[in-house]
Amino acid sequence: MKKKKKNYTFNKKNKKIYNIKEAIQLLKNKKSAKFIESIDAAFNLNIDPKKSEQNVRGSVLLPHGTGNTIKIAVFTTGKNIKIAQLAGADYVGLEDLANLITNQKKKIDLVIASPETMHIVGKLGPILGPKGIMPNPKFGTITKDIKKAIQEAKKGKINYRNDKNGIIHSNFGKINFSEKELYENFLTLYQDIKKSQPNQFKGIYYKKINISTTMGPGIIIDHLSL
C-alpha cells in the first residue's frame, strides 16, 4: 500500500522547528496569495558583522534557478560589447550606461563589468552599493569572461552577503517549483554559505534558519538535521 503523504499545518504563532522537507511542503500547502510568491531563506549567522574578517559573502548557481527574470547591465569594451548583447544583456555600454544608472530610469537587477571599465563603474558606488549590485570580483561580476557571467546569471546564479545584523537573506525559488526543486536549491545555497565560513571564526556558525513565502510568516528550520 502506498504510504500517504503527511500534510503539515502552520500558523503565525507556531514556533515548532521543522526539517527542511517538511517546511517546504508546509509552505506549498499554505499558499494563499493570488500571485506566484518567491520562497526566501534567512540564515542568522553567529558572526560579528562589525569585524570585516567575519563577514560572509559569495555566489552560487542554484540547480533550478530562482524563477526570476532579471535585467542585466554590462560595462565593457571592444568585442565584448557584441558578446554581451548576444549573451542576453539588457543594457551594454560605458558613459551612456553610467548616465542611465545615475538617472535611475531603468530597472537593473545585476551589473557586470570588465576590469578596464571600473574607473567608470567605481563612481556609481553610491547608487549601486546600497542596492547590493556593485560589481565585485568575489561575486564574479568583475570579470573578463562576460559571456559566462551573463549566462550563469540567467540560469540562476545568486549573490549573497550578510547584513549589519549578521543575517543572509536570499531567494531560492518560487512557490510553483516542485518540492524536490526547492529542496535541492535550498541545500545548494545552505552548503555554499557553510563553505564560506570565515577561517577566523570559531564556534557554532548557524544560529537560526527560517524560510518563508513573500507574504507568509517564517518557518524555523532544524539546521542540525541538514
Curated annotation (Swiss-Prot):
Function noted in UniProt: Binds directly to 23S rRNA. The L1 stalk is quite mobile in the ribosome, and is involved in E site tRNA release.
Gene name linked to the record: rplA
GO annotation terms (biological process): regulation of translation; translation
One annotated Gene Ontology cellular component of this protein: cytosolic large ribosomal subunit
Superkingdom: Bacteria
One GO MF term attached to the UniProt entry: structural constituent of ribosome
UniProt subunit comment: Part of the 50S ribosomal subunit.
Classification via InterPro entries: Ribosom_uL1_bac-type, Ribosomal_uL1, Ribosomal_uL1-like, Ribosomal_uL1/biogenesis, Ribosomal_uL1_3-a/b-sand, Ribosomal_uL1_CS
Lineage: Bacteria, Pseudomonadati, Pseudomonadota, Gammaproteobacteria, Enterobacterales
Organism encoding this protein: Buchnera aphidicola subsp. Cinara cedri (strain Cc)
The family this protein is said to belong to: Belongs to the universal ribosomal protein uL1 family.
Pfam families named in the record: Ribosomal_L1 (PF00687)
UniProt entry keywords in alphabetical sequence: Repressor, Ribonucleoprotein, Ribosomal protein, RNA-binding, rRNA-binding, Translation regulation, tRNA-binding
Protein name: Large ribosomal subunit protein uL1
Residues in coiled coil: none
